[in-house]
Amino acid sequence: MARLKEIYRKEIAPKLKEELKLANVMEVPRITKITLNMGLGEAIGDKKVIENAVADLEKITGQKVVVTHARKSIAGFKVREGWPIGVKVTLRRERMYEFLDRLLSISLPRVRDFRGLNAKSFDGRGNYSMGVKEQIIFPEIDYDKIDALRGLDITLTTTARNDDEGRALLRAFNFPFRN
């Protein structure tokens, strides 16, 4: 079992049950999935960009990546319907907790000028989104083998009913929020 999952079950869930005054331990908010998305506008001119982004995300997550395609043509962006414009991957269960552990303990401390995560990046339903400016903060990526620095979006989907519950859950996981 993943280290963070064990900590959640034994320490975080009982603590949150008391803190949020919930009747049942099954009501305690939990993280259901983590979605990583890389929007690649530059892929329009060069198809190799998609292949490199797929390789990077597969190294980071250890899971097969899905290529996202344009839903409709937009002349202003020179995009045609069906063209590949991004890559995404959804992590659940064990892989999700393993990734979260690596993100919190290894990757975020490697971010340049890191002052903490924005505590206001919740969507109103307890889900948290954050952006990473460069993929080299992950230890799986070899700095010498990348062709370009690419950012990615990370979204944590929770069962929390509102932002306060979601914030309490992520604080219990020791997320480094700015004050």
Swiss-Prot record:
One of its GO terms (molecular function) is rRNA binding. Disulfide bonds: none annotated. One of its GO terms (cellular component) is ribonucleoprotein complex. One of its GO terms (biological process) is translation. It holds the Pfam family Ribosomal_L5. Signal peptide: none annotated. Keywords: Ribonucleoprotein, Ribosomal protein, RNA-binding, rRNA-binding, tRNA-binding. Belongs to the universal ribosomal protein uL5 family. Part of the 50S ribosomal subunit; part of the 5S rRNA/L5/L18/L25 subcomplex. Contacts the 5S rRNA and the P site tRNA. Forms a bridge to the 30S subunit in the 70S ribosome. This is one of the proteins that bind and probably mediate the attachment of the 5S RNA into the large ribosomal subunit, where it forms part of the central protuberance. In the 70S ribosome it contacts protein S13 of the 30S subunit (bridge B1b), connecting the 2 subunits; this bridge is implicated in subunit movement. Contacts the P site tRNA; the 5S rRNA and some of its associated proteins might help stabilize positioning of ribosome-bound tRNAs. This is Large ribosomal subunit protein uL5. It comes from Ectopseudomonas mendocina (strain ymp) (Pseudomonas mendocina).
